[in-house]
Regions:
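Catalytic-pocket segment enriched in acidic/His residues
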Residues: 195-246, 250-252, 260-265, 271
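Short, surface-exposed, charged/polar-biased interaction segments
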Residues: 65, 114, 130-132, 201, ...
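Hot-dog-fold acyl-thioester-processing enzymes
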Residues: 1-90, 150, 154-223
């Protein structure tokens, strides 16, 4: 399995000519005989709010490993635009059974589809994790390489009309991104320190979108238990740190709907659904 630090060196310091206005080809990568670290799992569970019993993985943890293959694809010569110009729009994870921390895994990732949109180039990365020949976990991530369109203004997203249950309020400290990076191995500079995020146009450090998804899902695990399920999220407004956010959910047919919002409960950062398979 490739090191994210070495991949980020290529991503940050390698030169890309820019998007050539062409769809992307299919790109496939695989890592076999992947073994997990109990210590890293515990760190991840702690920073994301999961209870780790030493056996069953937090459902979002395997994304940490899938993203290493995503980063490998991002360094492919056919990807002619920089990683730092991309936006993670949405993510779907399907858990077909609980995965044990001592299992040997095969992780596959494929850039499967790309399409031109008014906002730029959208593309999908499909990730699969297998134990022997059994598919146990799958994810679909949709990214956007955005292009600026003169005169085009995006409307800010609005929170949904949701009957919140058991509303939580969380304080996100400025060092959250560094703690998540240590646990996940994902050292994207915009999540680490204000001095680094300012280099990319952000006055404050941003929370990682997949941390937000994991933190939200950790609050719903008492309902999910060991059932097979799918969790879909759309990433809305960025979360700057330090800050406070609110989280709530409601019951829907065959699952839960949830949101992470600003402290006033008006502006959405994350919207998602859990459905049982």
């Amino acid at each position: 399995m490739p090191s994210l630090l070495s991949l980020y060196r290529k991503i940050l310091f390698g030169r890309k000519p820019g998007w050539d206005q062409q769809p992307l080809p299919t790109i496939y990568v695989q890592a076999s005989n992947v073994m997990l670290s109990q210590e890293k799992i515990r760190q991840y569970a702690e920073v994301c709010g999961f209870e780790f019993d030493g056996v069953t993985l937090p459902p979002t943890y395997l994304y940490v490993w899938a993203f290493r293959l995503h980063a490998t694809i991002f360094t492919h010569k056919a990807v002619t635009f920089p990683l730092l110009g991309m936006i993670h729009l949405k993510n779907s994870i399907s858990v077909f059974r609980p995965v044990r921390s001592d299992e040997t895994l095969t992780v596959q990732c494929e850039l499967s589809d790309s399409r031109n949109t008014d906002s730029g180039l959208e593309f999908d990365l499909v990730s699969k994790v297998s134990v022997a020949d059994e598919l146990v976990w799958q994810a679909l991530s949709t990214y956007l390489y955005r292009i600026d369109t003169p005169g085009r203004r995006a409307r800010p997203p609005k929170a949904s009309e949701m009957a919140w249950q058991d509303v939580k309020q969380w304080r996100l400290t400025e060092d959250l991104g560094r703690r998540y990076a240590k646990a996940s191995g994902d050292y994207n500079l915009i999540h680490l320190h204000p001095l680094l995020s300012k280099r990319f146009g952000f006055e404050r450090v941003l929370a990682h979108g997949m941390w937000s998804k994991a933190r939200a899902l950790s609050q719903l695990m008492t309902f999910i238990g060991d059932k097979p399920f799918q969790v879909d999220v759309e990433f809305k407004l960025p979360v700057f740190m330090p800050s406070e956010v609110t989280f709530g959910f409601e019951s829907i047919e065959n699952g839960k709907r949830f949101e992470m919002r600003d402290v006033k409960g008006r502006r959405p950062h994350l919207q998602g659904n859990v459905t049982y398979l």
